[in-house]
Regions:
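FIC/Doc superfamily catalytic core
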Residues: 1-357
Length: 357
């Protein structure tokens, strides 16, 4: 089973215990009790132990020592999977948050361990095996229609995340009949149609994305920004991001270096397509290599990686746009992919359960 789903939300007491242990590196029951009493969250041993046990069960801390020498530490995990409660984190404004990384962290490549646990990978692979078995039994005409449906819904949601105001129905009419909706800017239609072009290109060349290179990534980006007055190729000027103090690299040479490191890491260090997909999706957003269209490129590139491994691509249809943006900002500011990973798993479950049936 996958641990710590968002519906299993930590209580205020549990969050405070976790932060106390993180801050102090280790803590005994007595120290935890004293801390809880100091912030008016209970002082009894039972209260402290209940909170500690919940954190152990969630896989966030571990018990060390024996008898009176028992203490607790944050469970050894990479910075890449550090736990943050999104609701609590985003109660503060960008200037109030404790942002660890205001600039690009080249050390991130040293902090990435196993992205998915063995049980998570087993569950994802089992879901995909079910999808693969179903698709074998479907006639080509149905497979074609399902990919068309997924294309419409991915184009709609990915564009919506970027502020596009087309409805799902209007998006379907635009893609299938090439009819633009009234009351919308031409650029919105172009953005949506470009998603279709990019996904068509990926579907036709899916095996080419088993090993990534800069040209393939630039090709996907070029298709997504065609006709939108966006320069193609790596950007040569600084960009800012709304809602965060994080500022991406502003030097073309460092941008290229970061992209090369990302590509090398993805190709040589990540053996399963799920890990490779989530890594590339986040890193393209983090590096912001292009003048515009970075997150669109990241979502399509992640799907290209999945398709190259014969894995069902994501439509993102049911994702909450605010959650998506929060997960990406958490990665910018803390280099933690944990919340984004939860969303990824949820979306994979959704797509396997709703397409190619």
């Amino acid at each position: 089973m996958i641990q710590l789903r968002r519906m299993e939300k930590l209580t205020k007491r549990e969050l405070n215990i976790l932060e106390f242990i993180k801050k102090n590196k280790r803590a005994s029951n007595a120290e935890i009790m004293e801390y809880l009493a100091s912030i008016s969250l209970g002082s009894s041993r039972i209260t402290a132990i209940r909170g500690v046990n919940a954190l152990i069960k969630a896989g966030l801390i571990e018990r060390k020592g024996e008898g009176r020498s028992v203490y607790y530490e944050e469970k050894s995990t990479s910075l890449f999977l550090s736990y943050f409660d999104p609701e609590e984190y985003f109660k503060k404004s960008p200037d109030e948050r404790n942002v660890v990384f205001e600039r690009f962290n080249f050390g991130i490549f040293d902090n990435i361990g196993e992205i998915f646990s063995k049980s998570e990978l087993a569950e994802l692979k089992n879901l995909n095996d079910n999808y693969a078995e179903r698709i074998k039994k479907l006639p080509p005409s149905i497979i074609k229609k399902e990919f068309e449906r997924l294309t419409v819904e991915l184009s709609w949601k990915s564009s919506q995340i970027e502020g596009n105001t087309y409805s799902l129905i209007d998006t379907e009419i635009l893609i299938k009949e090439n009819k633009e909706a009234e009351g919308h800017k031409r650029e919105e239609a172009v953005m949506i149609l470009n998603h279709k072009k990019a996904l068509d290109y990926i579907l036709e060349n899916r095996k080419d994305f088993k090993n990534l290179n800069l040209r393939k990534i630039e090709d996907v980006h070029g298709l997504l920004v065609e006709g939108l007055s966006v320069a193609k190729g790596l950007r040569k000027k600084a960009v800012g991001i709304t809602g965060t103090k994080y500022r991406p690299l502003d030097n073309e040479y460092q941008i290229k270096e970061a992209m090369e490191k990302m590509i090398e890491f993805a190709n040589k260090k990540l053996t399963d397509p799920f890990s490779k997909a989530i890594f590339t999706t986040l890193m393209i957003s983090y590096i912001q290599p292009f003048e515009d269209g970075n997150k669109r490129t990241s979502r399509l590139l992640g799907n290209a990686v999945l398709l190259s491994g014969d894995i069902c691509p994501l439509s993102y249809r049911s994702i909450n746009e605010a959650d998506y943006k929060k997960a990406v900002i958490l990665f910018y500011e803390q280099n933690s992919a944990r919340f984004f990973k939860e969303l990824f798993i949820e979306q994979f479950k959704f797509v396997v359960g709703n397409y190619f049936l």
